């Protein structure tokens, strides 16, 4: 869950949280690095992050290069969490299940190319979640139109609301 100022890393097995940690790394840090590297405002850095992100073809890879130190830390932390799970899962949870995928949520999971970079770095499938997928079958209410990339910012809120509805 990549937020504005921090990222929560959560391992779920069979729908149950078995490990969680938070790191002080989020979209604001991406923007600060871009603003400093390109001498632009925070707003221009935010637009650069969303529109160019990790696209090596844009601006001769300069935006990618500016973001790389931060996304590399994120990849390292994810790798550390996966390793921790594999080292400790059997004694804590029985036979360990392999981590098959990394689901990205949070407003700053929208960093262009992040899922591709992380998939390559971790050698695990990474993808942007769809927080509204299957969220309300059989319920007589509607959710205002929301694009998938916008819904990522509300994944936690949607999950908490669904917990109350399904209870």
Residue ranges and their predicted role:
Residues 1-167:
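Hydrophobic/aromatic-enriched cytosolic interaction surfaces used to assemble or bind macromolecules
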């Amino acid at each position: 869950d990549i937020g504005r100022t921090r990222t929560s890393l959560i391992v779920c097995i069979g729908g149950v949280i078995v490990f969680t940690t938070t790191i002080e790394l989020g979209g604001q840090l991406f923007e600060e690095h871009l603003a400093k590297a390109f001498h632009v405002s925070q707003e221009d850095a935010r637009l650069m992050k969303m529109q160019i992100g990790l696209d090596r073809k844009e601006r001769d890879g300069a935006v990618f290069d500016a973001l790389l130190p931060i996304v590399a830390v994120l990849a390292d932390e994810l790798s550390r969490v996966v390793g921790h799970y594999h080292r400790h899962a059997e004694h804590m949870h029985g036979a360990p299940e392999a981590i098959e995928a990394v689901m990205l949520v949070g407003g700053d999971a929208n960093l262009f190319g992040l899922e591709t970079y992380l998939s390559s770095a971790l050698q695990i499938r990474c993808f942007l979640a769809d927080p509204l997928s299957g969220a309300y079958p059989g319920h007589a209410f509607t959710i205002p139109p929301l694009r998938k990339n916008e819904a990522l910012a509300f994944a936690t809120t949607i999950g908490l609301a669904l917990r109350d509805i399904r209870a």
